[in-house]
Amino acid sequence: MPVEIERKFLVANDGWRSAICDSEKLRDGLVGEFDGCKVRVRLGGNRASIAVKGRRFGSRRTEFEYEIPKADAEAMLNTVCGERCVEKTRHSVPHAGFIWAVDVYEGQLAGIVLAEIELSDEKQAFEKPDWLGTEITNDPRFHKRALFRLCTDAGRPLTVAELLAAAT
């Protein structure tokens, strides 16, 4: 069974920008969510995918991801996902033998910059770059649904400080 082991962090400063080795515009949409699981469609560059993600246990969850036709992804994003879509630029940033994904959000989530690292084992050691901030792997305030709700309720994008101050 495919397992994703991922840790997520706030980004504290722009020190990562000088190390970018690749960048890609992505559009993600939430197809559905139930009992801690979710189905996400993604469109980026020349590829599209759909992922079924299981309930998170710490930094671990099952993930089944499949390529789909770009036209199908566009249709799902436009007709199924509605306002549960997010646009971001994902930057690949190498550091100490790992490639970090640094996501810079746009639109309703503008101003939010998150970094994630995928590991092969939950106890795998890694060196944290100087530009890394607080870990948010299990912080429900930074789940996409919570980010959307908080920004929608505020009627504007929120700063990271406002998100950190928000109740879960």
Where are these regions (language model features)?
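Phosphate-end processing signature that detects enzymes handling 5′-triphosphorylated RNA
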Residues: 1-168
